[in-house]
């Protein structure tokens, strides 16, 4: 359902309304999720090993090493091998949901940082027994838990008064931008401190256009600022922003913001803003047209003269 709606007056009589909604179809039915589709090809993930039978027993003292891997079709490519002596281990598997190399793990803490914009996911495998020297252990049936919320923006131009949206870019600012994922309890904790991430579109050309997905840290009762720069009817508009308060984003859920642009004062066509008085209607063709200025007038055949 709808979380919050805010309306804001804008320049040239072009108003902006933002509403943030939850998408039930994008919600997982289990704690561990392959929602959004199975993990994409070329996604990099890391396996960190601790000589502990349980995740609760993990510490920097029993750290045993890490390996980096990348999905490639039905196989896994090794970027950095994880080699372990005989023993019982807990594996922490994590990924930021992209193909980029993950920053080297230093074992300064049994945790890793996460920020808005990252599709952070984890899998914990405890009690792994490595029994034979020289053997290979296969870590199968990995099902990642998604810790962030998936999010996108839909920009909407007013039908009948505006042309298509042909360019769009924006930002989203939230009160919590950074978080820490703890290996010992498999939880992500966000810290206070605002931050901004980009929202992008791929060659938009329609009256309503969806952005690419990005990912946001879970947060409750948050003030979220959406700012857009876009082109409507070949007319550019910059720094159009609105702030919604009381927004809640839950992990492993999908949300979207509808950003609607409307006007009652004219028409945005051909790179210009036309006053209402510029519009005329031709009865023979049953079509509307726009005069090049507000000095030209027209009247119905049975109307009195204007002057």
Please provide the spans of the model-predicted regions.
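Sec-type signal peptide cleavage vicinity
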Residues: 1-268, 274, 280, 285-290, ...
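Eukaryotic nuclear/nucleolar intrinsically disordered, charge-dense low-complexity regions
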Residues: 296-303
């Amino acid at each position: 359902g709808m979380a919050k709606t805010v309306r804001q007056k804008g320049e040239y009589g072009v108003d902006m309304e933002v509403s943030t909604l939850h998408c039930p179809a994008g919600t997982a039915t289990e704690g561990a999720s392959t929602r959004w589709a199975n993990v994409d090809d070329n996604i990099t993930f890391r396996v960190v090993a601790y000589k502990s039978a349980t995740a609760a027993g993990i510490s920097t003292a029993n750290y045993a090493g890490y390996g980096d891997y990348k999905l490639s079709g039905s196989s896994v490519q090794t970027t950095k091998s994880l080699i372990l002596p005989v023993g019982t281990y807990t594996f922490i598997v994590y990924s930021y949901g992209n193909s980029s190399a993950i920053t080297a793990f230093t074992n300064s803490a049994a945790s890793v940082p996460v920020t808005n914009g990252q599709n952070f996911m984890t899998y914990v495998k405890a009690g792994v027994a490595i029994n034979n020297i020289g053997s290979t252990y296969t870590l199968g049936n990995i099902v990642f838990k998604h810790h962030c919320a998936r999010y996108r923006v839909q920009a909407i131009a007013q039908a009948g008064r505006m042309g298509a949206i042909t360019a769009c870019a924006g930002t989203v600012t939230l009160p919590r931008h950074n978080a820490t994922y703890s290996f010992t309890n498999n939880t992500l904790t966000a810290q206070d401190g605002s931050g901004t991430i980009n929202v992008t579109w791929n060659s938009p050309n329609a009256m309503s256009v969806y952005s690419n997905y990005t990912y946001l840290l879970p947060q409750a009762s948050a003030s979220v600022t959406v700012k857009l720069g876009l082109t409507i009817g070949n007319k550019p508009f910059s720094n159009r922003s609105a702030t919604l308060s009381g927004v809640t984003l839950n992990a492993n859920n999908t949300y979207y913001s509808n950003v609607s642009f409307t006007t009652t004062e004219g028409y945005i066509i051909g790179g210009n803003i036309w006053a209402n008085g510029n519009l005329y209607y031709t009865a023979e063709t049953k079509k509307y047209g726009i005069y090049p200025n507000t000095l030209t007038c027209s009247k119905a055949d049975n109307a009195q003269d204007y002057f």
